Amino acid sequence: YPIDALPDVIRRAAEEVGAFVKAPTVLVASSALGSLSLACQAHVDAKRAEKLQGPTGLFLLTIADSGERKTTCDSFFTSAIRQYQEEQAEAMKITVKEYESENAAWLAEREGLLSAIKEAGKKSKSTEVFKENLKQLEYSKPEPLRIPRLLYVDTTPEALAYNLAKQWPSGGMISSEAGIVFGSHAMGKDSIM
């Protein structure tokens, strides 16, 4: 494996982890590059030519026997990503509670206006004021929170697409066990097409 082709900081990290866990260089380097790619892909594009650039996301498949320390290597390099996710979730706990209460109040107010429109309609009374209030209320709908979630193991294509679109716009399926990825919902016969 051309470990010398890696930038110094990545090469040194891969060599250090490789020496510590006694795993094959290619396995360690793949874990390092995969985690680095995941951390950077939302922020950086790779410029391959003057008018040719694209995402830094990678598709990596490393084949190794059981016991070659795939999980250990991945854990070393994804630990910072996992820690970041946990810290962000913890830091946003109060904000999440505030959002939930604001959203519940907004939903209750919306439900009340819809009920008022329905009742007024049944009694053949004007619904214009309620409709206008409902229209104005729609503009004050609380924005859903975006809490970083970068790592996925077993998820459906629909859930992954939803999470990338609505919760956090970057993520990766990183697993040291191919069966989890290839046997997951995302690789089902209907999804893989």
Language-model segments: residues:
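Phosphate-handling catalytic cores of nucleic-acid transaction enzymes
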Residues: Y1-M193
